[in-house]
Amino acid sequence: IHEEKKKLADMSLHVITSMYSALSAKIPEIDRHCEQTAAYSRRIAEGMGLDETACTNAYYAGLLHEVGAVGLPDEIIQKSSLTEEQYEIYQTYVSRGYRIIRELQIADEVAEAVRYHRGNYDGSSYLEGRSGKNIPVLARILSVADYADRHARWGETAEEISQKLEERKETRFDPECAEQMRAILNPADQQQE
């Protein structure tokens, strides 16, 4: 049974790698973004004292969180601002990613993190109205990690990102996850406290 699970995991990894190769043609830098988001996710999970399995799953969630974008039309992927109709289509990438990860039989915690990572901590998002601790912890971690890397890619400094995390904790972000990300971005600030 263990050997069969390993084969399935290897096949799933191969399928996902192939999907990301296709996605890289549409979205330059997707590999780097997912790798950095994965690294941030793991560090946040470690900083929160989660066990090794949860830390590993946080890493995989970061690595796989964009997989659902594979089915998005080019005109949506390549635009910085979207019409309301295009935004509705864009939002489907989260549920598509969730389904892909579930079908590949990757850990449920990873699939749930991908499914809910675009949800706001206060429940004001489009994702089933979940809020606070009802959002899976790995999704709350992934939300912060994805945000930080995305904004860094857009040219914001660590200080600017840290300030936005501070302003948005309790509304968009889990306060503990936001604080862990701020500590990663500004390690000297945390040592002074």
What are these regions (language model features)?
Residues 1-8, 30:
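Heptad-repeat alpha-helical coiled-coil signal-transmission segments
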Residues 13, 20, 24-193:
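Metal-dependent catalytic cores of enzymes that make or break cyclic nucleotides
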Residues 8-15:
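Membrane-proximal linker segments that couple transmembrane helices to downstream signaling/catalytic modules
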